[in-house]
Amino acid sequence: MMILGIETSCDETGIALYEGSSNKIIFEALYSQAEKHNLYGGVVPELAARDHINRLLPLLKNKLDEEKIQINEIEAIAYTNGPGLRGPLMVGAGFANALSYSLDIPSIPIHHMEAHLIMAKFDSPQLDYPYVSLLVSGGHTLIVKVLSAEQYKVIGQTRDCLLYTSDAADEFSC
């Protein structure tokens, strides 16, 4: 089964096509809006949403053309439904639902943070449950015990401290 993944929770437009029978990512593409938002000192949700509107279809069309895949070969669409910025999330959900409706295929909402937790199993299938994951994504920094694909327990998280990384070194800021 070929599943298209769509990620628009903040300021990056991401798509990927996954083939379940071979457990393989056929393509992935990411467009970053970082330079645009740097002008304002942070992400401007309305600008992020508008940019997703302009980027999603051309990004998908380009990758399908590159891989010589017809859009009707996609059998399901998974999209980020939270957490994230409301406007960008709505753009991704709207695009996913419109495309799934037009292709008459399922549209599957995905929790962004839970997806990060399960990726460890995708990257390392031999990994057994339970395992512990350090999850750093956007404004979230968590230590999570993953009990199964559907069950997990947060065992630690930051309160008012964000973890920042740079090319030069890792640094903590509180």
Where are these regions (language model features)?
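Short acidic/glycine-rich loops and adjacent helix/strand connectors
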Residues: 1-167
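Single conserved hydrophobic/aromatic residue that forms the stacking wall/gate
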Residues: 167-174
